[in-house]
From Swiss-Prot:
PANTHER family: 4-HYDROXY-3-METHYLBUT-2-ENYL DIPHOSPHATE REDUCTASE (PTHR30426:SF0). It comes from Photorhabdus laumondii subsp. laumondii (strain DSM 15139 / CIP 105565 / TT01). Keywords: 4Fe-4S, Iron, Iron-sulfur, Isoprene biosynthesis, Metal-binding, Oxidoreductase. GO terms for biological process: dimethylallyl diphosphate biosynthetic process; isopentenyl diphosphate biosynthetic process, methylerythritol 4-phosphate pathway; terpenoid biosynthetic process. This is 4-hydroxy-3-methylbut-2-enyl diphosphate reductase. NCBIfam families: ispH_lytB, PRK01045.1-2, PRK01045.1-4.
Length: 317
């Protein structure tokens, strides 16, 4: 049995930055550090940060005075940001992915201009809640759609004053169908100058499509609440291959790979490489005898942490 590794896979620049912000805050200021929502959607990452002194909360009211607070990579609404700033906090750091912030700016711009805005995204996802929360113009409107059917059922105030944007971690194929419906339903709608679906989401979906075309079964390392990881498993299934979303090597069931020649392995943008390595070791214990990494797009994007966290511990001692 051979293991095929998708390329690229695992951490993206936004996730790497968000985790680094929490780690640096813990190193520089010590525990506890409060984080609104899981900093990224990965159980292994969150559990490790929790052990080091990060406290994950959902409500700003849970944060005591004089504490240090970090917003997660998914972003927050203007209301949450204002609430945090009104508190007597020692420091406030924003780990929102810069590519999510780009979408926030698009929504805020639409709100200022009085344009109605339509967001393509999954209801209940924290990124969607934060993005929707950038709009505050009562004379306009902010709407959420998930499917072409939602588009055809949508009622807006002015069909000639519309724009749209998307969640950054969606299925490229599904989103294309929704955009086609938007353009058909609202011919004058304006989209973003550049795709809102981020480079990492697009690259990993392209890579898993290539992987699934060769593999007999695909294992996607990622947590159940990770949007981009779920999309990878769904895409592999659409190619016609069995695909399983796993948090760790322990989740692998032997019957998944019984009689299989090629096992494909990839990881969502919030899954660390150590989990992939553990999956490889588990597969080797079940009979895998070689590992091959596929060719893919090279990624060299880096997002800096806030300047306050780019200092040595001794500088603030």
């Amino acid at each position: 049995m051979q293991i095929l590794l998708a390329n690229p896979r695992g951490f993206c620049a936004g996730v790497d930055r968000a985790i680094s912000i929490v780690e640096r805050a813990l190193e520089l200021y010590g525990a506890p550090i409060y984080v609104r929502h899981e900093v990224v959607h990965n159980r292994y990452v969150v559990d490790n940060l929790r052990k080091r002194g990060a406290i994950f909360i959902e409500e700003i009211s849970e944060v005591p005075d004089d504490a240090i607070l970090i917003f997660s990579a998914h972003g927050v609404s203007q209301a949450i940001r204002a609430e945090a700033r009104s508190r007597n906090l020692t420091m406030l750091f924003d780990a929102t992915c810069p590519l999510v912030t780009k979408v926030h700016m698009e929504v805020a711009r639409a709100s200022r201009k009085g344009k109605e805005a339509i967001l393509i995204g999954h209801a209940g996802h924290p990124e969607v809640e934060g993005t929707m929360g950038q709009y505050n113009n009562a004379e306009g409107g902010m709407y959420l759609v998930e499917s072409p059917a939602d588009v055809w059922n949508l009622k807006v105030k002015d069909e000639d004053n519309l724009c749209f944007m998307t969640q950054t971690t969606l299925s490229v194929d599904d989103t294309s169908e929704v955009i086609d419906a938007l353009n058909a339903r609202f011919p004058n709608i304006v989209g973003p100058r550049k795709d809102d679906i981020c480079y990492a989401t697009t690259n990993r979906q392209e890579a898993v499509r290539d992987l699934a075309s060769d593999a007999d079964v695909v294992l996607v390392v990622g947590s159940k609440n990770s949007s981009n990881s779920n999309r990878l498993a769904e895409l592999a299934q659409r190619v016609g291959k069995p695909a399983y979303l796993i948090d760790s090597a322990e989740d692998i069931k032997e019957e998944w790979i019984t009689g299989i020649s090629l096992v494909g392995v990839t990881a969502g943008a919030s899954a660390p490489d150590i989990l992939v390595q553990q999956v490889i070791e588990r597969l080797k214990s079940l009979g895998a005898d070689s590992v091959q990494e596929l060719h893919g797009r090279e990624e060299n994007i880096v997002f800096e942490v806030p300047k306050e966290l780019r200092v040595e511990v001794k500088e603030i001692s």
